[in-house]
């Protein structure tokens, strides 16, 4: 997957070096690994979502990481001051969390307290209700019948070059680069 922005576009929130390793090496390795595992697996023509919901072992892990990273890298834009959602998504934050600020606080807390490696997700259910989940390793909310909308990667490779062991600082900074138009389209 090609980035929709130049690697330095997310600075200072995510450095060009982190993008080079995270997208250029980690994600590329998952793609290469999955391609090597697919032949003869029965999943050759399946979508990533289908693979993530049905596969096990290495196929699941690599497909899950590809799907997670596609959603992750696809949600960013250059840093923006006062970056906030609008429309139906903003209304859903108010309905399901009390306010956008309350949502952000809970989301960051879930990301900061996830033990080990994984992802914190905002997803919608079939009725449009918003949910925050912690998913370990390569798991994705599609496995629970949810529609993934927004994710923060809490694997150390996502932030360690820029933030070292300060995961909460990384999570707090990510709000500046969320492209809410992308998230709103996913929610629609």
Across the structure, where does each feature detected by a protein language model lie?
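Feature for soluble, non-membrane regions of globular proteins
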Residues: 1-188
């Amino acid at each position: 997957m090609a980035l929709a922005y130049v690697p330095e576009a997310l600075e200072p929130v995510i450095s060009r070096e982190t993008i080079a390793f995270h997208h250029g090496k980690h994600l590329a390795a998952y793609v290469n690994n999955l391609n090597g595992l697919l032949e003869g697996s029965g999943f050759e023509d399946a979508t990533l979502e289908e693979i993530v919901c049905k596969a096990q072992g290495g196929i699941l892990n690599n497909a899950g990481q590809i799907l997670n990273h596609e959603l992750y890298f696809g949600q960013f834009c250059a840093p923006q001051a006062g970056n906030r959602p609008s429309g139906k998504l903003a209304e859903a934050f108010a309905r399901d969390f009390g306010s956008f600020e309350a949502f952000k606080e809970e989301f960051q807390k879930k990301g900061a307290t996830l033990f080990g490696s994984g992802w914190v997700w905002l997803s919608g259910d079939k009725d449009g209700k918003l949910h925050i989940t912690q998913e370990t390793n390569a798991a994705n909310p599609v496995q629970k019948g949810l529609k993934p909308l927004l994710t923060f990667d809490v694997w150390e490779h996502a932030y360690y070059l820029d933030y070292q062991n300060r995961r909460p600082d990384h999570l707090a900074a990510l709000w500046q680069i969320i492209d809410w138009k992308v998230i709103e389209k996913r929610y629609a």
